[in-house]
């Protein structure tokens, strides 16, 4: 009976430790993805100031794809809304780049940045 209790306690401890490790790995993955998003955003800004539409397009499409990844397990309606705004603005940014519309691309970039700031404000509240 005592051996059974020890095995049970060890199993529970192992499950707990594995769940903590999973959370740390998820956080690390999330941080890596956010760094990629920031790098793509910086590249877009560089493309805007140099009117390099291929650079804007490439990075806007990469951001749009990356933005479709699931970031939270329990997505609130507010979070989903922020994600949709992000997808929309990265999409309009890519379209403006295809059309070589610097003013449209600049506006979309500004809207995208606003969406990023709002989403991070929301995440800090969760």
Explain the meaning of each model-derived region:
Residues 112-124:
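The canonical Cys-X-X-Cys-His
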Residues 22-113:
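Extracytoplasmic c-type cytochrome modules immediately beyond a signal peptide or single-pass transmembrane anchor
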Residues 14-22:
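C-terminal segment of classical bacterial N-terminal signal peptides
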Residues 1-12:
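Bacterial N-terminal signal peptides that target proteins for export
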